[in-house]
Amino acid sequence: MAEVQQLRVQEAVDAMVKSVERENIRKMQGLMFRCSANCCEDTQASMQQVHQCIERCHAPLAQAQALVTSELERFQDRLARCTMHCNDKAKDSMDAGTKELQVKRQLDSCVTKCVDDHMHLIPTMTKKMKESLSSIGK
């Protein structure tokens, strides 16, 4: 049961990441590469100046990638805390003498609720991420 829930979350997060990459990150990558190419075409610049220029071109993309990574880690941490709470409740039930099958059902139900609750957060997280990405480099 937990594997099914994990797959649901993974597919939703993968779809969100693909959307963000296609609509935001890819454009930023194009800008970064074109900007870097312009740096290299400056025949008057020193090697150090070209390097600094390329670093400046890369900064918005690096900031964007850090933002996406941070948001995904935060989401993952919240989901992990929720499922840990489910595991703790299951262990407490086992310790109290509840039958294993009943504990397994409770655990599955709890994990499903965690996943359902967190699936509802994905659209808001996506919107917030895209808004933040749009403001980077402007």
Curated annotation (Swiss-Prot):
It comes from Mus musculus (Mouse). Transmembrane segments: none annotated. This is Protein FAM136A. The gene is Fam136a. The modification Phosphothreonine is found at T124, T126. Belongs to the FAM136 family. The lineage of its organism: Eukaryota, Metazoa, Chordata, Craniata, Vertebrata. Coiled coil: none annotated. The keyword Acetylation applies. It holds the Pfam family DUF842. Keywords: Acetylation, Phosphoprotein. InterPro entries: DUF842_euk (IPR008560). It comes from the Eukaryota. The modification N-acetylalanine is found at A2. GO terms for cellular component: mitochondrion.
